[in-house]
Amino acid sequence: MEIKVTEIRENKLLGRKEIYFDIIHEGEPTPSREAVKGKLAAMLDLDPNTMVLQYIRSYFGSHVSKGYAKAYETRERMLYIEPEYILLRDGLIQKEEE
C-alpha cells in the first residue's frame, strides 16, 4: 500500500487540516481504515487521536482508492465539531452503555 497526498488545505476557522490522498493498493484489497489512518499520520507527523478519516472510495476495476481525512489541532476541537457517528466509526469515542 502506498499513499500519495494530493492536497492539504489549512482550515483556520475550524482549526484543522483537510487532507486529500490517493491509496495505491495494486494486487491487494482496499486497505482498512486503521491501516490508512496510521500510515497517513506517520507520514505527515500527525497525532492519530486528533485525526478523522472521512472516507475511502474505491472504484471498480481500479487499484487506486481516493480518501479524505481531517486532522484537528486539539482533541477537544475534534469532539466539538465532528458528528458522533464519525467518531464512533473511527474508534475515537466509545458508545455509552445504558
Curated annotation (Swiss-Prot):
One of its GO terms (cellular component) is ribosome. GO terms for molecular function: structural constituent of ribosome. The keyword Cytoplasm does not apply. Keywords: Ribonucleoprotein, Ribosomal protein. GO terms for biological process: translation. InterPro entries: Nucleotide-bd_a/b_plait_sf, Ribosomal_eS24, Ribosomal_eS24_CS, Ribosomal_uL23/eL15/eS24_sf. Disulfide bonds: none annotated. Belongs to the eukaryotic ribosomal protein eS24 family. This is Small ribosomal subunit protein eS24. It comes from Thermococcus gammatolerans (strain DSM 15229 / JCM 11827 / EJ3). The gene is rps24e.
